């Protein structure tokens, strides 16, 4: 139980760190000389909304929702990976058309990588929950 609880806490903390990195990267780029295009921001918003849904599902799982379907979560994670690939291609196309600055390619890819890593941590959380390790252990009575 304690190793599972430690894993839950580590992944939740990691998700928080990655989310902060995403927010800082996007904010920094939008305050600087080079800004993301409206299309790029729209795609990033969509990716964050998808990861938010996955995160909500994994929180329900570690809160004791035994009906959480790990296969469905993996499908959602796969959807994010496909969106990631599409967003990278779209960014390169926008750079080619002059809609996005090539100097934003590395920060944009960093954001996408962090979104993928959040998805990985969400999958980890559900896998731990499937082993009957949940946050309910914090509230166990003596």
Each model region followed by its residue ranges:
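Cytosolic, long alpha-helical scaffolding segments
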Residues: 1-142
